[in-house]
Curated annotation (Swiss-Prot):
Entry's Gene Ontology cellular component terms: motile cilium
Binding site for Ca(2+) 2: 133, 135, 137, 144
Any one GO molecular function term: calcium ion binding
The keyword Calcium belongs to this UniProt entry's keyword annotation: yes
Residues that coordinate or bind Ca(2+) 3: 170, 172, 174, 176, 181
Protein name: Flagellar calcium-binding protein
Pfam families (alphabetical): EF-hand_7 (PF13499), FCaBP_EF-hand (PF22592)
UniProt record similarity statement: Belongs to the calflagin family.
Principal location listed in the UniProt entry: other
Organism: Trypanosoma rangeli
Keyword Ligase applies: no
Biological role: May contribute to the rapid motility of the trypanosomes, playing a role either in flagellar structure or in calcium metabolism. Could alternate between a GDP-bound inactive form to a calcium/GTP-bound active form.
Superkingdom of origin organism: Eukaryota
Length: 204
């Protein structure tokens, strides 16, 4: 992506075009087994074993990061693979809170589905951002945001005053919204591109 040219063919700051990411996203959606089905559970068991290189029955962050690149190949979608740390931390913390057990430093199989759900959600935010960022400069301006209101509402947002909401996103008052600012806002509102009925609620 870039500031000039079509969004689909231009390059952006992280070296991935919107078209590249869309193709990669369709593949990633298929390889993250987050559904509550017997078939998905079997796939999770197999995936967990591939991540668990030390065969300890629990995953360190290094193992998760390595698995996301070597097994899931998430780096084909975006170099922002570091966001796996957010999914890892949320899953292990929530798993321990829900079950009153688990490790503070590892994700066990009990929390593995939670982690995959969070991972999916974080990467889905990149898809949303690409849809709105029509200039392709990896920043949202007020006009882009206002134009995207119908799409944002389809994803679950409730926006009565686009200008006020944009100011809320633009925390530093720069006049533009970064991916991180958008991600924080969208995550808090649980926006969803594909209407997934099985998202993990924050209060779960």
């Amino acid at each position: 992506m870039g500031a000039c040219g079509s969004k689909g063919s231009a390059g952006n700051k992280d070296g991935k075009s919107a078209t590249d990411r869309k193709v990669a996203w369709e593949r990633i959606r298929q390889v993250i087994p987050r559904e509550k089905t017997a078939e998905a559970n079997e796939r999770r068991i197999d995936l967990f074993k591939k991540f668990d290189k030390n065969d300890t029955g629990k995953l360190s962050y290094d193992e998760v990061y390595s698995g996301c690149i070597e097994v899931l190949k998430l780096d084909e979608f975006t170099p922002r693979v570091h966001i796996t740390k957010r999914a890892f931390n949320k899953a292990k913390d929530k798993g321990s809170k829900l079950e009153n057990k688990g490790s503070e430093d590892f994700v066990e199989f009990l929390e593995f589905r939670l982690m995959l759900c969070y991972l999916y959600d974080y990467f889905e935010l990149t898809v949303m951002f690409d849809e709105i960022d029509t200039s392709g400069n990896m920043l949202l301006d007020a006009k882009e945001f206002e134009k995207a209101v119908p799409k944002l509402e389809q994803w679950g947002a409730k926006i009565e005053d686009p200008a006020e909401v944009f100011k809320e996103l633009d925390r530093n008052g720069s006049g533009s919204v970064t991916f991180d600012e958008f991600a924080a806002w969208a995550s808090a509102r649980k926006l969803d591109v594909d209407g997934d009925p099985d998202n993990v609620p924050e209060s779960a």
